[in-house]
UniProtKB/Swiss-Prot annotation:
Name of the protein in its database record: Toll-like receptor 9
Tissues and organs where the protein is expressed, per its UniProt entry: Expressed in the basolateral region of gastric epithelial cells with high levels detected in antrum and body mucosa (at protein level). Detected in spleen and stomach at higher levels in C57BL/6 mice than BALB/C.
Species the sequence originates in: Mus musculus
Gene name for this UniProt entry: Tlr9
LRR repeats: 62-85, 87-110, 122-147, 150-166, 167-190, 198-221, 223-242, 243-268, 283-306, 308-332, 333-356, 363-386, 390-413, 415-440, 471-495, 497-520, 521-544, 546-573, 575-599, 601-623, 628-651, 653-676, 677-700, 702-724, 725-748, 750-773
Residues binding DNA: 47-51, 72-77, 95-109, 132, 179-181, 208
Subcellular location: Endoplasmic reticulum membrane; Endosome; Lysosome; Cytoplasmic vesicle, Phagosome
Amino acid sequence: MVLRRRTLHPLSLLVQAAVLAETLALGTLPAFLPCELKPHGLVDCNWLFLKSVPRFSAAASCSNITRLSLISNRIHHLHNSDFVHLSNLRQLNLKWNCPPTGLSPLHFSCHMTIEPRTFLAMRTLEELNLSYNGITTVPRLPSSLVNLSLSHTNILVLDANSLAGLYSLRVLFMDGNCYYKNPCTGAVKVTPGALLGLSNLTHLSLKYNNLTKVPRQLPPSLEYLLVSYNLIVKLGPEDLANLTSLRVLDVGGNCRRCDHAPNPCIECGQKSLHLHPETFHHLSHLEGLVLKDSSLHTLNSSWFQGLVNLSVLDLSENFLYESITHTNAFQNLTRLRKLNLSFNYRKKVSFARLHLASSFKNLVSLQELNMNGIFFRLLNKYTLRWLADLPKLHTLHLQMNFINQAQLSIFGTFRALRFVDLSDNRISGPSTLSEATPEEADDAEQEELLSADPHPAPLSTPASKNFMDRCKNFKFTMDLSRNNLVTIKPEMFVNLSRLQCLSLSHNSIAQAVNGSQFLPLTNLQVLDLSHNKLDLYHWKSFSELPQLQALDLSYNSQPFSMKGIGHNFSFVTHLSMLQSLSLAHNDIHTRVSSHLNSNSVRFLDFSGNGMGRMWDEGGLYLHFFQGLSGLLKLDLSQNNLHILRPQNLDNLPKSLKLLSLRDNYLSFFNWTSLSFLPNLEVLDLAGNQLKALTNGTLPNGTLLQKLDVSSNSIVSVVPAFFALAVELKEVNLSHNILKTVDRSWFGPIVMNLTVLDVRSNPLHCACGAAFVDLLLEVQTKVPGLANGVKCGSPGQLQGRSIFAQDLRLCLDEVLSWDCFGLSLLAVAVGMVVPILHHLCGWDVWYCFHLCLAWLPLLARSRRSAQTLPYDAFVVFDKAQSAVADWVYNELRVRLEERRGRRALRLCLEDRDWLPGQTLFENLWASIYGSRKTLFVLAHTDRVSGLLRTSFLLAQQRLLEDRKDVVVLVILRPDAHRSRYVRLRQRLCRQSVLFWPQQPNGQGGFWAQLSTALTRDNRHFYNQNFCRGPTAE
């Protein structure tokens, strides 16, 4: 952590304030704090938990701000002066600041207050969004307004005064003001003629408002009218009178089909939306008509008379399964481009066959037909025969129909067809059933479904989305994903030679492909076989596809998980046009080809495998990728890599430009080894376990342009780490543990960066932190600088923006605490001394001198206790030769000579007494100069002479010093024991020792004796009888 620290005096606070004020005046900080300035004049204040509209600094150029977004804050009160400084604002978004009770996540009640002139100050305002706020009336609005959204509010009434004066208004959204999520007591009321004064209004949306009829006297300028999901059960010409300019009309969901509803549904009392035959006759400009989810059972051809410009018709989620096969309603819709008939199934029934009505052949302009969820089991040439000759039909959706037999060759006769979606069916192979004639269709077998509530699967899963993006520019694409295919046979694709893109993902294909499965598909360029169980062993796999450019074999892990089974990747060599290959998430780790060879492959996805284990197998797989001579992009994410050796990088293709090592377990990376990849431009190391960027630097001459080391545990970066990478443009250091960002890391290239991402790091926001100046210098290149770059310390600023520093935190904290402590001490002394002198001056004087007198005595006693010359004075009867011999040859030798550094200092009469002194003086000095007095006795019944005198002096020491220093060693355990010995054994057993008669017990005896001589006898007393001598 590199910080520029300054030693500051508290008096410098005013100086610092002046400097900071000057800095703010110069505009070095982001001008729109706490918000973020985005391109095209947008100030983004979303998700900042603001409680009021922010006031920007004087340095902010508010005249250039045209858009302000305040989504998802906590602004409950808007004042007249809130937007005065934004005179040129054109777009204002205030969604989700004070949501109504039903829409609040915790169902809190909230009411937004808007003062009368709040928006009138913005004379150029064109777009205002007040959706998802608890407002009950329309506020006063500027006449310049063009687009207004009042959806999901509590506004229940629109009258002539609500929108008076808004002559420029073109778009009005007021959806969801009264429905199950935002309930009200009745319905939204739009008084007749309330909107008639809006002469330029072209778009009106009133969905989910419990309306029972279309509002009367709407402006004739309307082009888009959306009144779906209300309670309108009847529609006649008078409901749409004078709306001759109408181009799009949505009246769907007003009489719902509840068996297919994904949300609360009320059964329609009319059983079906009642449409007058002439309801739409006068709408000659109508281009889009939505009648979905209206419980329609039949189609009346008169509904569409006069709709000569109708191009989009949505009839989904009705009961039109009979009309689809017999209707004449489509005869005059020659300009219809898109028709949606999905989920018009009969309840609990799956048809054996389906044949479209002959009137479909008149849809000569039809480009897209959606027939998902009609539920029929056989698809043959008669099913769609009236569509085959449509010259413009390019997209056909047949998902979720329970189709189990499909004659795919029929799509080869469609002249303009570009995309067929047969996913999420039950197709298991080529059609084997006898083909029914059109006449047999009416008597087709019906199968009852087990579930009465079939709900559609998501139409756009991530896998299907990626597949569609890859194939959107091809001439012919077919999606057979999520079916029941187990094997692939060439007869399935007869007459489909022009097919260029095919998806067979999410099936159960478990065969060994050998070069014969796709023979008819000579023009196929993209093949998706992900999420299957393919066996890749034959070297001729996919060789029948000479134009194949992209092959997805990901998520075919089952064969690779079979122990002992080998797999062959040599087929890649023979695919001369292949550019993109995915072997991802197959758990490939052993028994595969030791090399991948191809001159054409440019992108290889090998993520989700076991490359870490493969590279650990000696040199067997060291050259696994080296044969891909033209490889540009390699993905090795999630490969359980714990270490990456230089030779691993050295044996990657030199042509490599992108290398992804994301989400592995790398804790070390040899940066100098990047020189082995001279063309590398992008390196992704995110999600690993790097602790620091300190082992070397990026090599000189590298072409690296983007480096991502986010989501690691990086705490430090070595100086000049990035400096030599002169081509570097993007650096991602986010989600690490960095406490600072230092200029020395980058050197001169810092100004060449286009992106420097340091979000989600616990930066230390100390006064003078160097990273603040650096980030301000490159602030346009730092994503989320205003709010995403936050402090991790000190505690007062944790989790807050780096620009939220308190001026008081810029003081030198050590100096501040020192000054505080000294001043506190001075005040305390100044108060306590006079008070004590006044109240108890004499007593303090007496106690002081008393303590002063005791100090030398205490010092002397401690000094004497710490400097006693002997550990034990040994007393024994010299007249007993056996005892004397044991003392000199056993006791002395054991305690003084054989203990090494732990040797005890013994005081012996014949050796240590001073000549010239009396016996009593020597005895006194020996007892008081030793920590313990050790009595060695042969028996305890008769003690006299020196032994008796020594014992009495030891007892005298007990009385004077409160120290029990007596230790008894009895050499004959069977001798008679005196009452004193028996009492001492009861009170202090460890101070009475007996010489063992058996040699194997002598080791324990010496250990017990050492303990008795080195520890205070107070610890040996039996607490049940006595606590031992204590100091007073």
